[in-house]
């Protein structure tokens, strides 16, 4: 299988040599397939075969200028998290090797094992069951112990009052004014928890059907942080609202609490974290929409996503 160039013409000669240097004697790469559904990095499934054996690995490489600048921190963080979570019940990939600076590869890269399962974003009959499993999995992630040097960095907010991009043709400007006003208040105090920080259906793999449906993998740990559990819950809530409609997002915090998770005691604090996340998606959630459309959700047009986001923000503001 020729891996010298990818579809954009970038060289992968050094990366391939580095990957093969991590393999067992006699193993070699025989095929590569681009994995879709992400936008921050290029992901490839690599088929590796050796004498009487075969296995699949996943290669993450940062190639875009912004992420090249931050690749060292992102990939080092993910490598540390995979190592931390390895002995736990959280279904994560196993770390094989990392070149966080691109010293040996064409681009900064991380090599890991392949997890079973697929991303499922459809509006099918098991969407509610998937949401329950997401809530249970997120509560388990938040119970991860990470003290001292193993504790990740503090969370970073992904928007601010003056950075919110209000939809150009909104018919509800007062809704956005009220939402932005909430963000102008100081962040509420919180009890720190181990956060995935980008937990949503696009970063979770499912296996099985019906009663046998289960989560078989949680991926993309480059943003792992220490912060309020509400922020992770808010992020998944916003994503569910965009994928399935505002009610799905508004129900998720209750599912999380039913699964044993703990949220901020005051309604005002919970509202702050949910709006801090939701307003980062304005005006039309394009960053997640592109990979979601690649995975089959072509119905998620900018107009649909803007309407769902506004409906969700209205629901958050209306909740006591």
Which positions does each model-derived feature cover?
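Actinobacteria-biased recognition of intrinsically disordered, low-complexity terminal regions
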Residues: 1-9
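Short, flexible/disordered intra-domain loops and linkers
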Residues: 3-4, 65-73, 289-301
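An alpha-helical support segment within catalytic cores of ATP-dependent transferases
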Residues: 10-26, 127, 140-197, 201-213, ...
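Conserved N-terminal boundary motif of the eukaryotic protein kinase catalytic domain
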Residues: 26-33
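ATP-binding pocket architecture of kinase catalytic cores
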Residues: 33-154, 174
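Active-site acidic catalytic loop and adjacent metal/ATP-binding pocket
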Residues: 36, 40-48, 58-59, 95, ...
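Active-site activation/catalytic loop segments of kinase-like enzymes and analogous catalytic loops
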Residues: 231-262, 276-294
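Helical subdomain adjoining the active site within ATP-dependent kinase catalytic cores
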Residues: 284-320
């Amino acid at each position: 299988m020729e891996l010298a160039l990818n579809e954009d013409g970038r060289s992968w000669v050094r990366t391939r040599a580095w990957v093969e240097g991590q393999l067992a004697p006699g193993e070699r790469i025989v095929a590569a397939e681009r994995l879709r559904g992400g936008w921050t990095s290029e992901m490839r499934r690599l088929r590796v075969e050796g004498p009487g054996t075969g296995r699949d690995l996943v290669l993450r490489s940062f190639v875009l200028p912004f992420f090249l600048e931050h690749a060292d921190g992102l990939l080092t963080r993910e490598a540390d998290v995979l190592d931390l979570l390895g002995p736990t019940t959280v279904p994560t990939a196993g770390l094989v090797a990392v070149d966080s600076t691109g010293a040996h590869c064409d681009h900064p890269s991380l090599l890991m094992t392949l997890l079973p399962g697929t991303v499922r974003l459809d509006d099918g009959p098991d969407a509610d069951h998937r949401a329950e499993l997401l809530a249970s999995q997120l509560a388990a992630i938040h119970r991860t112990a990470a003290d001292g040097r193993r504790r990740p960095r503090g969370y970073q907010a992904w928007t601010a009052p003056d950075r919110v991009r209000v939809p150009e043709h909104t018919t509800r400007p007062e809704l956005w004014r009220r939402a932005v006003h909430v963000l102008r208040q100081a962040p509420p105090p919180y009890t720190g928890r181990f956060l995935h920080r980008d937990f949503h259906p696009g970063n979770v793999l499912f296996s099985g059907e019906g009663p046998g449906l289960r989560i078989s993998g949680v991926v993309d740990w480059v943003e792992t942080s220490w912060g309020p559990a509400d922020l992770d819950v808010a992020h998944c809530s916003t994503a569910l609202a965009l994928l399935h409609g505002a009610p799905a997002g508004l129900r998720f915090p209750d599912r999380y609490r039913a699964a044993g998770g703990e949220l901020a005691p005051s309604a005002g604090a919970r509202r702050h974290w949910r709006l801090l996340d939701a307003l980062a998606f304005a005006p039309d959630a394009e960053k997640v929409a592109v990979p979601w459309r690649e995975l089959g959700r072509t119905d998620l047009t900018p107009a649909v996503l803007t309407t769902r986001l506004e409906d969700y923000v209205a629901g958050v503001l209306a909740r006591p």
